[in-house]
Design a protein with these regions (language model features):
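Long, low-complexity interaction regions most often at the N-terminus
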Residues: 3, 107, 132-136
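DNA replication initiation modules
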Residues: 8, 60, 65-100, 126-180
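A generic structural motif
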Residues: 118-124
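Short aromatic/hydrophobic-glycine micro-motifs
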Residues: 25, 108-109, 143
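Short beta-strand
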Residues: 110-117, 146-150
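Short, glycine- and small/hydrophobic-rich beta-strand elements in well-ordered beta-sheets
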Residues: 4, 105-114
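Short glycine-enriched loop/turn motifs at secondary-structure junctions
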Residues: 79-80, 116-118
């Protein structure tokens, strides 16, 4: 049961403003891995057709990629992780909720949403001294290690729309576990 009722009008905008409350903070949002934009959250007019977000504030509008090209989405312009996101492709999807609840026993679970496919994305508020322990546990349970290696990785946008047309539904949201 989600601490905040999803069916009582919780919207994408409300969730994003709680996840990223700094009005001057830059966020990177994408319609695809190749079509994205970095701006202040309030500058985005309609994110309903987007499917991705970086779970960290961006430090500047553009950075330099490892290939030496300018980009709005790269490690050079990505700040520290704000949230740690697990994507479970394995084991089977029926086991994902139990795995997430097991991690929730130790780490602060903020949000769970559908990938719009077969997996769930679980957003955690992890303290700096817990980072290594968190990833060790998450990967042991089947989380994709790619999200651990790259803090600028795209994750699924709450209530976004995947390229297959499915909404990335939020199932759980606990505003008491948000970052300050």
């Amino acid at each position: 049961m989600s601490p905040m009722r999803i069916d009582d009008g919780l919207t994408q905008k409300m969730i994003l403003e709680m996840l990223f409350p700094d009005p001057n903070g830059l966020v990177c949002v994408g319609k695809s891995a190749f079509e994205f934009h970095t701006a202040r959250l309030n500058q985005f007019k309609d994110l309903s057709q987007c499917q991705f977000i970086v779970a960290a504030y961006m430090t500047k509008p553009k950075g330099i990629t490892q290939d030496g090209k300018e980009s709005m989405h790269c490690l050079d312009n990505c700040g520290e992780r704000r949230y740690f996101v697990c994507d479970f492709d394995e084991p089977k999807s029926a086991d994902h909720p139990a795995i997430i609840m097991q991690l929730k026993r130790t780490f602060d679970l903020v949000m769970v949403l559908s990938s719009g496919g077969k997996s769930l994305h679980a957003w955690f508020n992890v303290q700096p001294d817990e980072e290594e322990s968190f990833w060790q546990s998450a990967i042991e349970y089947g989380a994709d290690p790619a999200l651990m290696r790259n803090r600028s990785s795209f994750v699924r946008l709450p209530f976004g729309k995947r390229d297959n047309g499915k909404t990335q539904q939020v199932f759980y949201f606990d505003y008491t576990k948000l970052k300050d």
